[in-house]
Amino acid sequence: MAFANFRRILRLSTFEKRKSREYEHVRRDLDPNEVWEIVGELGDGAFGKVYKAKNKETGALAAAKVIETKSEEELEDYIVEIEILATCDHPYIVKLLGAYYHDGKLWIMIEFCPGGAVDAIMLELDRGLTEPQIQVVCRQMLEALNFLHSKRIIHRDLKAGNVLMTLEGDIRLADFGVSAKNLKTLQKRDSFIGTPYWMAPEVVMCETMKDTPYDYKADIWSLGITLIEMAQIEPPHHELNPMRVLLKIAKSDPPTLLTPSKWSVEFRDFLKIALDKNPETRPSAAQLLEHPFVSSITSNKALRELVAEAKAEVMEEIEDGRDEGEEEDAVDAASTLENHTQNSSEVSPPSLNADKPLEESPSTPLAPSQSQDSVNEPCSQPSGDRSLQTTSPPVVAPGNENGLAVPVPLRKSRPVSMDARIQVAQEKQVAEQGGDLSPAANRSQKASQSRPNSSALETLGGEKLANGSLEPPAQAAPGPSKRDSDCSSLCTSESMDYGTNLSTDLSLNKEMGSLSIKDPKLYKKTLKRTRKFVVDGVEVSITTSKIISEDEKKDEEMRFLRRQELRELRLLQKEEHRNQTQLSNKHELQLEQMHKRFEQEINAKKKFFDTELENLERQQKQQVEKMEQDHAVRRREEARRIRLEQDRDYTRFQEQLKLMKKEVKNEVEKLPRQQRKESMKQKMEEHTQKKQLLDRDFVAKQKEDLELAMKRLTTDNRREICDKERECLMKKQELLRDREAALWEMEEHQLQERHQLVKQQLKDQYFLQRHELLRKHEKEREQMQRYNQRMIEQLKVRQQQEKARLPKIQRSEGKTRMAMYKKSLHINGGGSAAEQREKIKQFSQQEEKRQKSERLQQQQKHENQMRDMLAQCESNMSELQQLQNEKCHLLVEHETQKLKALDESHNQNLKEWRDKLRPRKKALEEDLNQKKREQEMFFKLSEEAECPNPSTPSKAAKFFPYSSADAS
């Protein structure tokens, strides 16, 4: 069900799936086999094999990284690496020679580096790098990182395995498979990706918390870890599984060198400031280039010597140690050595120096110039591996009755470059150990001592004598971390007493209460390697000797298994990163589509209301125009009607005037004849004047009545139009209110919808994190089970070997004790032969009982060991389960906090939006009221303008004055 939900989260619709796209630096139209010829295999990476290829035309060599890609999405995962390689032209970064995608395989052709990776060189030479070599590598890595960071590129996987060497002594930074190319200078990343042992603390935190992203400073931390790795062959905490390493990095102090006294103050200070857990105070690559540790480096001679040594011709010589027949010689030599143990001073058990390893007296490291020029001297290098030939750990011969075993030195061999002083030191060491050498010792003068970790001895109880110390396994440092120890016992033998040397050679069996003989197979063979090479015209010869032991094979096996585990983890990280990228792309697409939809909805709503407003305004205009037309018609008709009435009134008025004239004539005719003429003339003049006055008054009165009637009609028309415009304004404002209310409602709905989408996306993101975390936990449990099974199998094998070895040891000890007992009886000379035979018989019976008791003790010890081992395995699983539960719980808590913070942020945004909504409503109402007041003011001004002069139009293009043309 969870997997189905996971697939649903990452599922995209059909139209969202990406089509095949062309990439600038990837060719699809060419088969790489037509251009390149595979001439060999270089290695097997986490995502594909790496081949050595040769250009068919130019003959140039390249490293071909061939990756099978099943889809375009997988192909896109590697495009970042190709783009980074194509855009980074730097002398210390590998160059891209071409990229091809053909037949479902991606071919990435990069520059071929014959020197190989630094970690492979260290394994080949079986030692870490010297400080001058580390300085040159560090300087060149810093220059490469400074260039990358200036291009806004984070490497994210710095380690010795990704630092390649050329024959010219320069490095090439490689493997940009998990690198990030930012778009902005201050951009940060939150992907949990990289190799755990080299991860910065801020990157580790991104496994469960994405709130603390990291930037290019993470590469500086990885650089510091890489320098420690080059000094000690292995990175810090390499003995832990990746799960514990992440916890260790996050909670512990920054790692340091195991033996700081061997290294310079500048190196230690450089590591201190580079391994700063606070990325804000951690320096950048440009700042570290000014550090005294690397600022004065101008020559790469140290790296040229390193590459020449790694690529030099090797002459190997395997020398056999004691064979089984030599055991009898060792038994015969017991009588000779017995005198030594009796005559010399009493030797206490080797617990006096049990807590002090051989590195207790390390040689002082020399300056870089001195160490480079002293190849042939035994202790000239801090690592002590370039030219050391020392005495091998002595083989333990059978001991005396007190249970003390006597050391028998192995053969000693002299290196090609040894001078006479080393021989004197060896002779002096033998002289200090005292006594005569046994014949077995005289026959083994060619073997040389191996590295301290290779000479670790095991007791029957599984305890180790590492570097000459009797320490329990929990306190003993891991083997690979001791590979850079001093020049073994050659430089320190003169200051060590006999008791210390003896403690190196003996194996203490605490439960049996006696010292047991070591397994002869442990020192069966010695491998001597002689390397001859030329640097700057000077021929250098370096001889190293190493005892081949089972521990060597175990170390190699553990290294291989750890690489396998890291490869599995890298695959999980890559898949997780791909899923995270797909989910992020899906979320971005969802947000983009949602924003587009929101914008479309808002635009559609605005368009709807704009259309309504346009329709309303158009209707208003049409209605007003129609009303104006009606009003004009009404004015003309009213003016015509009034004119007709006034004409009739004027006609009647004229008739009345005529009647008045007749009456005046009648009155004059009634006068006497002599007065008529004069009176007629006078009356007629008066009548004419009165007629004119009355006519003028009548016409003026008619005109005034007409204008008043027209004014009333115009006022009525204007009032009617004003009412209509008020009505339309109210409708328009109501429509505007509806428009804004709809937009506000949509905004609130969109806020809610966006919050729900972001919340669901956050849940999907954490669901994916939980899914990937559970997959990682399942892989970690699987690795832990394999580790526990290996430990149990190794314990069973060791117990089987001890069980098979015990009878041989008992027989050898029995012979020795019987011989010594017979010799003591012979010396004492007491009793008859029968009594001596009886004593020998009793002694033999006691020996049988003692041996039987030892076998029972061994069986009981093996049972206890197995029980403890099973308990330890169960404890490992329980601890792992607890750590995984804590991570899951932390992830759930963080998800809860993020969801809560998201809800609070949404509520706050909603509150702020509502708070801003009130002023918006108020501003809208004020704007609408202002428009209403402006309209009323316009109408009022129109009325006032019409009052003093009725003939003046109140509103242009809407109200027209009365004119004589209206009446016609």
UniProtKB/Swiss-Prot annotation:
Quaternary structure annotation from Swiss-Prot or TrEMBL: Homodimer; homodimerization is required for activation segment autophosphorylation.
EC category: transferase
Catalytic activity: L-seryl-[protein] + ATP = O-phospho-L-seryl-[protein] + ADP + H(+); L-threonyl-[protein] + ATP = O-phospho-L-threonyl-[protein] + ADP + H(+)
Biased composition (Basic and acidic residues): 835-865
Official protein name in the record: Serine/threonine-protein kinase 10
Gene3D superfamilies membership: Phosphorylase Kinase, domain 1 (3.30.200.20), Transferase(Phosphotransferase) domain 1 (1.10.510.10)
The protein's Enzyme Commission number: 2.7.11.1
Modification Phosphoserine occurs at: 13, 20, 191, 438, 450, 454, 485, 514, 549
